[in-house]
Amino acid sequence: MASGSYWCYSCSRFVWVSDSISCPDCDGGFLELIQEPLDFTPSDSFTTTTTTQHRSPTRFPPPSSSSSTPSASMHADNSPTPTIVTRTRSNRSPNPVIVLRGSAAAPSSDVVSEGLDRSAFQMYYDDGTDSGLRPLPPSMTEFLLGSGFDRLLDQISQIELNTNRNLRSCEHPPASKSAIEALPLIEIDPTHLLSDSQSHCAVCKENFVLKSSAREMPCNHIYHPDCILPWLAIRNSCPVCRHELPAEDLTDGTGAALTAVTATAEEEEDSAAGLTIWRLPGGGFAVGRIPGGWRGGDRMMPVVYTEVDGGRLGDERLPRRVAWGSRRGGRDGGGSRERGGGFAGRIMRLFGCFSGSSGSIAAAAAASSGSGSRIRVTRRTRSFSMFSTASSSSRRRNWLA
């Protein structure tokens, strides 16, 4: 093996490796074999300077290309010494990685590992040259899927599956409009204020004001009108005792029932579009959600801003946007990108789990082919991040989107 023939993306320099193919300095496996390595002997000063100034990964294209290969300058004794490449926005390693759902085609045996269908995901990166999103090379995709990404994506899929089950188990439809309008509007009197159960609104927990207005449920529980009406718009039960009002008539006029969870084709395109996954400097991953509203014919997709990407949380700058490159998919590891309904329909079934239980995302649930039913649900959109590796417990944190 030629000395110094491997480039470490973590240390941003050429290194000698053992048979285990790992960097002897950072013990990382993010290495690339350079076919024509520079023949030099690194000095102690070079090692120290490089290690301290280039801890952050280097972005594609790899160092073997002319744009990012560390050039050699000649000393008086004609011995080549490396020229340190300044870390810029255009030469960092692919971070974040854009993850989209892959093709629904049956996977081949060589893309399935440890129970995860690797063809179920498409991975892209922005090379920082305004050329748009590019599919990750096959070798890099295989590396990421073998370094914790597979467990991370598998865990995300399990969360999505559990969330969909919870949506399907929701048995409380909205209250009917006539039942809501029939709720009496009463005036708060001293007897209400003396009662433990009627002195305050059970939704906002605030005490009623004498001679103010309140809505009274058939179960005699009373609420502020501004509190109970939004509640009854999403479920027909009393927040305290679960007494149920008549439910909304979920029919479309032709006898075909509408389930409590559906979306039209336009709402599907407004749902979650995908994920942005960052590798954190201290290890592990951070996951951000690409906001909805993306259309199949659009050339642009929004990308979340974080400290890892050079911005500060709370910064007033607009989120950075990246465009799809002219090269799409193929055999470069990302799969083909279709325009129009095919690709849009595929990405609309992406990670609907990235929202809290109190929240509202236009869930992209496919309509049942035989029943003619349509599903409709809204929950508040919220981003979600995983700071530990997929094998550790995840923690929540909002990312700017």
Curated annotation (Swiss-Prot):
Question: Top EC class per UniProt?
Answer: transferase
Task: Specify residue ranges for compositional bias: Polar residues.
Answer: 76-93
Q: Which reaction does it catalyse?
A: S-ubiquitinyl-[E2 ubiquitin-conjugating enzyme]-L-cysteine + [acceptor protein]-L-lysine = [E2 ubiquitin-conjugating enzyme]-L-cysteine + N(6)-ubiquitinyl-[acceptor protein]-L-lysine
Could you give a GO molecular-function term held by this entry? Answer: ubiquitin protein ligase activity
Q: What EC number(s) does the entry state?
A: 2.3.2.27
| One GO-annotated biological process of the protein | protein ubiquitination
ZnF RING-type span: 201-242
Which Pfam families does the entry mention?
DUF1117 (PF06547), zf-RING_2 (PF13639), Zn_ribbon_19 (PF14369)
Pathway participation: Protein modification; protein ubiquitination
| Alphabetized PROSITE patterns for the sequence | ZF_RING_2 (PS50089)
Keywords annotated in UniProt: Metal-binding, Transferase, Ubl conjugation pathway, Zinc, Zinc-finger
InterPro entries listed in its UniProt record: DUF1117 (IPR010543), RNF126-like_zinc-ribbon (IPR039525), Znf_RING (IPR001841), Znf_RING/FYVE/PHD (IPR013083)
Signal peptide (UniProt feature, chain positions): none
**Is the keyword Ribonucleoprotein in the record?**
no
Region annotated Disordered sits at 41-93
Q: What does this protein do?
A: Probable E3 ubiquitin-protein ligase that may possess E3 ubiquitin ligase activity in vitro.
Q: What is the protein name for this chain?
A: Probable E3 ubiquitin-protein ligase RHC2A
Organism listed in the record: Arabidopsis thaliana
What is the organism lineage in this UniProt record?
Answer: Eukaryota, Viridiplantae, Streptophyta, Embryophyta, Tracheophyta
Q: Which gene encodes it?
A: RHC2A
